[in-house]
Amino acid sequence: MSVPTVLEKILARKAEEVAERRARVSLAELEAQAKVADAPRGFANALIAQAKLKQPAVIAEVKKASPSKGVIREIFIPEDIAKSYEKGGATCLSVLTDIDYFQGSDLFLQQARAACKLPVIRKDFMVDPYQIVEARALGADCVLLIVSALDDVKMAELAAVAKSVGLDVLVEVHDGDELERALKTLDTPLVGVNNRNLHTFEVSLENTLDLLPRIPRDRLVITESGIVNRADVELMEISGVYSFLVGETFMRAENPGAELQRLFFPERGVAVSGSTLD
């Protein structure tokens, strides 16, 4: 028997987690919570509007740890990070809620969203409609669907549930086959290309550039992972990509918002130096 990959382990645990949560809070209870949650802030619209101006539309990630890197940020205060990102020019936030592998929390999402006016995506491994309704109940504005973690039927089902509760969907692909499946199955305008190879964990920005010609112009391409310096940003912008999801680069900086501004808006100077993280 082959050894399970990290993704397979995560998905197996996620199925158990959903069962545990459903035993504590019924779907009907969650649906009632979702109906009275704060109105969605328009995750997709915010990104599209910024990218149309040919300005960086940055999804800034609130992430404490990862399976491959361990703890990335020791002093981790979601409210302060969110405020810092907002001052630095982020368009949206991404908050990790996976507990077992990323040391995330539902509470982190609620804290980050309450501290700013930015739309927020729940970054987790979505495998069940329960999690989608739960995301809206928590106040999320968007959910992530990872093609490598889902078959086409499940992907379509989760997207339909997201639409029914007012959530936007960001679909994440790693290669051409996954891109083809995503475009065939979903009509979401947000297509994220992860530059990290799931098998080797190596990162190459060429992944986004290679897939770019195959993505229809009515979809917004978001490059994920591997943006570490101005040259990376400029390479993407020259290629027509203005949307970015960045986590680790910001999380390792003393002031995440200042690092965001330095990387994406250097012409603005040091306006965020007075943030709560100085």
UniProtKB/Swiss-Prot annotation:
It comes from Pseudomonas fluorescens (strain SBW25). Gene3D superfamilies: Aldolase class I (3.20.20.70). It holds the Pfam family IGPS. The lineage of its organism: Bacteria, Pseudomonadati, Pseudomonadota, Gammaproteobacteria, Pseudomonadales. It catalyses: 1-(2-carboxyphenylamino)-1-deoxy-D-ribulose 5-phosphate + H(+) = (1S,2R)-1-C-(indol-3-yl)glycerol 3-phosphate + CO2 + H2O. One of its GO terms (biological process) is L-tryptophan biosynthetic process. One of its GO terms (molecular function) is phosphoribosylanthranilate isomerase activity. Pathway: Amino-acid biosynthesis; L-tryptophan biosynthesis; L-tryptophan from chorismate: step 4/5. This is Indole-3-glycerol phosphate synthase. Keywords: Amino-acid biosynthesis, Aromatic amino acid biosynthesis, Decarboxylase, Lyase, Tryptophan biosynthesis. Belongs to the TrpC family. It is an enzyme of class 4 (lyase). Its EC number is 4.1.1.48. NCBIfam families: PRK00278.1-2, PRK00278.1-6, PRK00278.2-4.
